[in-house]
Amino acid sequence: MKTKILFLLLMTGFSIQVFPQNTVSRVTDSNTALHLLQPDYPVPYGPAKTEDIIAVLDRIYTFLDISTPAGIIDRQTKTEITNMSKLTAGSVFEPGIFRLISYEWGVAYGAMLLAGEATGDPKFKEYTLKRMNLIGVVAQYFKTAPVTGQQPNSPVRSVLDPRALDDAGSMCAAMIKTLNSGGKPALRSYIDNYIDYISKKQFRLQDGTLARNRPLPNTLWLDDLYMSVPALAQMGNLTGDNKYFDDAVKQVLQFSQRMFNKNQGLYMHGWVEDMNVHPEFYWARCNGWALLTMTELLDVLPEDHPGRSEVLELLRSHIRGIANLQSGNGLWHQLLNRNDSYLETSATAIFTYCIAHSINKGWIDATANGPMAVLGWNAVQTKVNSKGEVEGTCVGTGMSFDPSFYYNRPVNVAAAHGYGPVIMAGAEMIKLLKNYQVVINDAAVMFYPLGTDWSKYR
């Protein structure tokens, strides 16, 4: 009988709701501390562990040590040359995924030195010393045959005959850092050659601002700050000659007068003298180069230099502008103020390094800026794959005055621009974690001075 009634009810459209005997209570404000629910973060949240950072750096090191062999071969026979007295005009560097001489690898050499300092592991420093000293030996051979050495297919043409700031600045700064870290004295002659190009041969505007005639006459590329100023600053530190510091400061201030938007706290990528209106495209990596330039300059600029306070205030203003635009997953966008442009790794790594370094130096407040650096690193480390490759890095990029150009630049793990910055960011985060208590308080990352009983602030 019961079965028939149930059948009739179903046939006539009635539905029966069945309730379980043990009903689970619904989460409400009255029965749950909702603020303690665990968020679904897109990247790890909270302070990184030093051992985890070192593991990331080790992975990158292993990949790069294999990908950039420190060897010489005969161009024709491909035979390895182990006796440097047997070099010939046909000697070239053993091929790898990345070139040993490039502005990107100048960053990587300096980054390896920083990683060695932060971790205490000598392999990072040895990476740079081995390759830089090899470059010096090969350059010395080709220097004795200048016609051969300056030909386009010479492995050291850009060392002996630099023709652009891209050739000179980053490698020069890295060579000086290497020299100060135990590199062979023979590097000094190539340092002098690079500096001579930057100081005397590179095209400048009438007021002395470093410029290019590409893609238009009298054009400033923000990237060129990094391709010149760190080398000038390091040379000032090496020689004690203030003329290098003066030129370095002049470049930062005169670029900034033309290219820094004080309201946005950001730099435009390009500036052309003959334009009546200057389109402002805030490309992420060029802003990274500018911030890294000021960071490296302040590292060695004498405290009593008359331009120091102005450079320091520019750095602080720039960091404030960048801070406003970090995405929710810790990365910054390819065009910083356009959230529909893709998220980019190399710029994020540079920003993370510079912010962490500025905190460690006492230039900016740890409480306000530290969580941003932690989030930046947590995002960056997710872009280092199991092979040690850095993903999500924009390839080399020219200048444009339309957004589509920047939106559609490819990314590639072979883009050399990402490796040095990621190593730098990791190394500086290790130092940051040693200098502050970084904890989770009330579910958020907080920075406290060492020795603080932060539990009383819960």
PLM segments and residue spans:
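Bacterial Sec-dependent N-terminal signal peptides
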Residues: 1-23
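CBM-like carbohydrate-recognition segments
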Residues: 22-103, 118, 122-125, 130, ...
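Active-site mouth of glycoside hydrolases
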Residues: 45-48, 214-215, 277-278
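Alpha-helical support elements that line or immediately flank enzyme active sites
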Residues: 112-115
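Extended ligand-binding groove/face enriched in aromatic
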Residues: 125-126, 136-270, 387
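Short, solvent-exposed loop/turn elements at beta->coil junctions and helix N-caps
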Residues: 215-216, 337-339
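Extended ligand-binding clefts on enzyme/binding-domain cores
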Residues: 222-334, 341-352, 364-398, 402, ...
